[in-house]
From Swiss-Prot:
GO terms for cellular component: cytoplasm
Matches recorded under PANTHER family: DELTA-1-PYRROLINE-5-CARBOXYLATE SYNTHASE (PTHR11063:SF8), GLUTAMATE SEMIALDEHYDE DEHYDROGENASE (PTHR11063)
Gene Ontology process terms (BP): L-proline biosynthetic process
Metabolic or biological pathway, per its Swiss-Prot or TrEMBL entry: Amino-acid biosynthesis; L-proline biosynthesis; L-glutamate 5-semialdehyde from L-glutamate: step 2/2
Subcellular location: Cytoplasm
Function of the protein: Catalyzes the NADPH-dependent reduction of L-glutamate 5-phosphate into L-glutamate 5-semialdehyde and phosphate. The product spontaneously undergoes cyclization to form 1-pyrroline-5-carboxylate.
Molecular function, one GO term: glutamate-5-semialdehyde dehydrogenase activity
Domain of life, source organism: Bacteria
Assigned EC number: 1.2.1.41
Keyword field contains Amino-acid biosynthesis: yes
Annotated PROSITE patterns: PROA (PS01223)
Identification of the protein by name: Gamma-glutamyl phosphate reductase
Keywords: Amino-acid biosynthesis, Cytoplasm, NADP, Oxidoreductase, Proline biosynthesis
Amino acid sequence: MTYVDTLGQQAKVASRQIAKLSTAAKNDLLNQVAKALVAESDYIFTENAKDMANASENGISKIMQDRLLLTEDRIAGIAEGVRQVADLQDPIGQVVRGYTNLDGLKIVQKRVPMGVIAMIFESRPNVSIDAFSLAFKTNNAIILRGGRDAINSNKALVTVARKALKNAGITADAVQFVEDTSHEVAEELMVATKYVDLLIPRGGARLIQTVKEKAKVPVIETGVGNCHIYVDKYANLDMATQIVINAKTQRPSVCNAAESLVVHADIVEEFLPNLEKAISKIQSVEFRADERALKLMEKAVPASPEDFATEFLDYIMSVKVVDSLDEAINWINTYTTSHSEAIVTQDISRAEQFQDDVDAAAVYVNASTRFTDGFVFGLGAEIGISTQKMHARGPMGLEALTSTKFYINGQGQIRE
């Protein structure tokens, strides 16, 4: 039996044991985990410091190091996220529909757990606890495989959760942690059809593509965000400037940060020079511009074709000038990763056309793409942002981690 087989078997057994946990029992456990995270924060910080030291030694960028870092505020935020999940309505057992058919059969469709969820993710250690809390709230066992960069932090966080489970008399195997960060083990998890009911990859384009190519278990694709801001010819340019600055600079290393700016030709001569000046007062951003934009920006560099398809996760932004709304929509649909896209305009009909025609999970009018988030959308913590169309799309909250089952009650009916 391989390492993944052992984890999978333990998770499968655990999933059956926790399947009938009551809402009260689940909420109590989650609140205990939240308390334990704060109480054991010194242990977590010690382990996180090891990851930070390794990151510095390995030349990982400051932006990516920020994703790794755990502070008192961030631990408090993670704990609060767990408490918020405890406060959310429990979807398990909810009736989706119920009716009596022509044969007199009483048919009820209810929400039920998936079973065993596996998650492969990169860098941000908070993901481990977010994923656990959502999986546990929906009576699912979860197998977590984080990246090498955050191995010590992830292990510490999962250790705290497992200890809380054990103290509550619940099997600690409800959350499994993959300590082997090799690609071989990750790929073995991708094909563990005997144990895994759903695999969720959360990370960069390379990870997502690998999972799409090699997975045999059901997958929900998440994460990659080549997000665009389109500044229309009818935009309020001051508003557009603030939206672009926020979407690009507030936290560039996350998937809902803007990576590409598309500007209508009618306002480009006024907008781009002013944007460049305004953003430079806050943060140095490298603009990689097409030929028309390049002439209007003092410090921009020429964009390569690849730049328009790149999720930079850095203070870098591609710039494209278009002559019409239709051209903007076609351009975005060519390069989008179907995550989050935005238009800035005062024209309602153009805004509606953009929202209808752009193919993305979240499409904004006059707002930053940075709002695509489970908490902001009122879903509680999210396990990821789905960029596909099957089963779940956009921020994935509790319902996305459930399946349904039909309960049919009869009185001796047979089919003629």
